[in-house]
Amino acid sequence: IVQVTRKGTGYMPMSADAPKGKSKEDIEIFPEKLNGALNGDLVEVELISVFPRPRGRVKKIVQRAKMQFVCTLRKVGDKLVATASDMRFPVAIDVGPSAEKAKEGDRVLVKLLSFDGTTAKGTIIEVIGAAGEHRVEMNAIVLEHGFSTQFPPEVLKEAQDIEKNHAQIISDEVGKRTDF
């Protein structure tokens, strides 16, 4: 699993049980040698030198760690592109026609369709709202970490049932409790 810094350099432990971080046991992978790999991706790495420290290049991305990114839309020329909140995602994402449902400055959830290290294509799957609004930023944080902002129907139904039967539930519970 490759770990990419904000500056774009990747590090990968020489072995699974090696300590994580920038230790001498890590293989250093320069940004131009990541070949489209992103932070957390499971990759195959080829060792290309060992002195003064191990250096390598990504041969193959085995599995993407993440396919959805919270982004902010900005205008480039006559089209909107999405810039990821995660500074380790190095390029703007071309969201094509899916940008029609949003406007410049909106926070959006983008599904990554392709990324080769220099160009990225994706599609907007959710417009979160205008950047800077408290509710929007809170939802963006939740989505960035892979959680949903929507509750499943069965949870919503249970919440409605509790609301309807609130008084009965309270009176039943009070009888079961003992004050000390």
Name each model-derived stretch.
Residues 1-180:
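Charge-lined substrate channels and their catalytic hotspots, especially those that engage the 3′ end
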